């Protein structure tokens, strides 16, 4: 059970950091949406 909790927390932390960097610095990839 503890392994599941630790894994979930680890993935959640990595996900939050990833999205924080992603939204702070938009990828320089041409998108059809524009903006």
Swiss-Prot record:
Q: What is its main location?
A: plastid
Outline what the protein does: Found at the monomer-monomer interface of the photosystem II (PS II) dimer, plays a role in assembly and dimerization of PSII. PSII is a light-driven water plastoquinone oxidoreductase, using light energy to abstract electrons from H(2)O, generating a proton gradient subsequently used for ATP formation.
Coiled-coil stretches are none
* GO biological process: one example: photosynthesis
Designated name of the protein: Photosystem II reaction center protein T
Q: How does it sit in the membrane?
A: Single-pass membrane protein
Its localization reads:
Plastid, Chloroplast thylakoid membrane
Which organism is the protein's source? Welwitschia mirabilis (Tree tumbo)
One Pfam assignment: PsbT
Superkingdom field:
Eukaryota
Q: Which family does it belong to?
A: Belongs to the PsbT family.
Q: Which residues cross the membrane?
A: 3-23
């Amino acid at each position: 059970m503890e392994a599941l909790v630790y894994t979930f927390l680890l993935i959640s932390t990595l996900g939050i950091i990833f999205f924080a960097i992603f939204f702070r610095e938009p990828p320089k990839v041409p998108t059809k949406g524009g903006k």
